[in-house]
Amino acid sequence: MNIESKIKELTEKLNQYAYEYYTLDEPSVEDSEYDRLYQELVKLEAENPQLTRADSPTHRTGGVILDGFVKFRHPYNLYSLGDVFSREELAVWEERVRKEIANPEYICELKIDGLSLSLYYENGLLMTAATRGDGTTGENITENVKRIKDVPLKLKEAIDIVVRGEAYLPRKNFAKLNKERELEGATPFANPRNAAAGTLRQLDTKIVAKRGLATFLYQEASPATNDTQEEVLEYFEELGFQVNPERKFARNMDEIWEFIEEATRLRDELPYDIDGVVVKVNNLAEQEELGFTVKAPRWAIAYKFPAEQAETEILSVDWTVGRTGVVTPTANMTPVLLAQTTVARATLHNVDYIEEKDIRIGDHVLIYKAGDIIPKVGKVLLDKRPEGLEGLEIPTKCPECGSELIHFEDEVALRCVNPLCPAQIREKLIHFASRDAMNIVGLGPSVISQLFDKKLVADVADLYQLTIEDLLTLDKVKETLAQKIVSAIAQSRENSAEKLLFGLGIRHVGGKAAKLLLERFANLRALSKATEEEISEIPSLGGVIATAVVSYFETDGAKILLDELENAGVNFDYLGAVNIEGILSGKTVVLTGKLTTLKRSEAKEKLEALGANVSGSVSKKTDLVVAGEEAGSKLTKAQDLGIEIWSEQDLLDL
């Protein structure tokens, strides 16, 4: 046997042994035999590096020092899930599904508390691994993910597929890691989720390999070739992915809740952290029929476990002004440990919330973290209230500018409507420069506050006139940081226009809505001239957003600001694929079978450029099926329904 054949044999044998060990939990050889073969492969590859295969298991342990993480644009939108926190809220969602789908069936899965990632395979080989990021753009973490031993470098089938899952740190490995950090004098991680996220952002891949991350895969992001979520998970197992075995088929709310109760009992016994249960409509065609909101699928929901609570005392209340003028109360409290972090402040939301709970300074309260992130006051312990405590004094004037505060009838918030309120301007500047908006690195709250206080900037357009000399007048800003900020400001001029639109801070327009708006109108100037009717035609965007956008661009201030930004050289064009009226505009199209000329992602991009909505399953709402070679059940179903069929060549001819 020649060396190339020997390397191939060892690689395939070791990958099979790893699959048996990590996925099937049924090892067929002793560790010593695996180690012997592994060392033999290491030696052969070292002597013949040109023969090292892409799926070699040695990629999992070898060390690479990365320069950083490059951005990765996902070819598919990776939506987050909506959350519910009670049986009543879950029942509302289930009833909403039932109104659209007759006799829906569900799959209930554990919600793993880790870091979301996507794996991209071509011809069965792992080519790219990326974080979810904002759902459109994440970070390429391929080298680190290759060090996770249960992630297959080569699938059991030579297919193109994109899968989503969760990387997590098992509790045993988390305890070991924190013990090592304490011995080294480093700060322990607060929880396994933070440890997993920190590990995947390591530049030294040897550290990733050492820490022992693991994964569970749960969704096909590329158009699915199965009919149900249950079939998708079974197919994943056949391909070699690690799939969580704790799942249940359910037909109604009672059966869903039975699984949630079982998951609650299991929670402390599992070798990994979970923070809830995900409920999905099982049938993929029905998922397609239900569709998406701007942020989340309508066919799935995440039930989050009740949050951990802690008792503390309210010492004082601060009132702060946000960029939209909303005045928010925040409680200062006796510091207390909650969900493994020390908490000393909690939001009180608004005046109605304070009055409803009758919150007073000096009260003992129970606090919790909503979604395990934001501290909130849940309950006042009235039996511990000292005598004589007076109710909170509600401000009538803005704490920043002194203007009268307004309480509109249709709102619960107090609002400062002074457009020149310094707090609002400062917060708008901070928002504009933030990561999800224009991403001006180095231009954080401290620097912006100083620029504003020194009257070096008064609106976002002024940022593009800043010089290194201006920045050097600020406290703790040296030459290197000043150059970095000026460079980041210049770079932000080239951003795609949805970043700018989000950065303008128009009410109701978040990142997803901004992207949908620019996909449709292609240019910020064109959007600024759009009517409410035109905007309302965009799927997932309603009249509230349409009214907010049109009202904003009708103001003199917005018109002046656009001129200033354009004169400063800021890009107004959307740099992604534009959904203009095309031959397939508004059509729902399904791809099936093997394509011989185009990659599946290329075919999807071409269809979307023609205005199509690309779906993963065939239903009565499907307008067209593009069928490649060896097309199976989807093609048969389309023919039965009388749906128009195209070949790959038909698509290429366009």
From Swiss-Prot:
It holds the Pfam family DNA_ligase_ZBD. SUPFAM superfamilies: BRCT domain, DNA ligase/mRNA capping enzyme, catalytic domain, Nucleic acid-binding proteins, RuvA domain 2-like. Keywords: DNA damage, DNA repair, DNA replication, Ligase, Magnesium, Manganese, Metal-binding, NAD, Zinc. It catalyses: NAD(+) + (deoxyribonucleotide)n-3'-hydroxyl + 5'-phospho-(deoxyribonucleotide)m = (deoxyribonucleotide)n+m + AMP + beta-nicotinamide D-nucleotide. NAD(+) binds at residues 31-35, 80-81, 109, 132, 166, 280, 304. Its EC number is 6.5.1.2. Residues 579-654 form the BRCT domain. Zn(2+) binds at residues 398, 401, 416, 421. GO terms for cellular component: cytosol. PANTHER family: CHROMOSOME TRANSMISSION FIDELITY FACTOR 18 (PTHR23389), DNA LIGASE (PTHR23389:SF9). Belongs to the NAD-dependent DNA ligase family. LigA subfamily. This is DNA ligase. It comes from Lactococcus lactis subsp. lactis (strain IL1403). The gene is ligA.
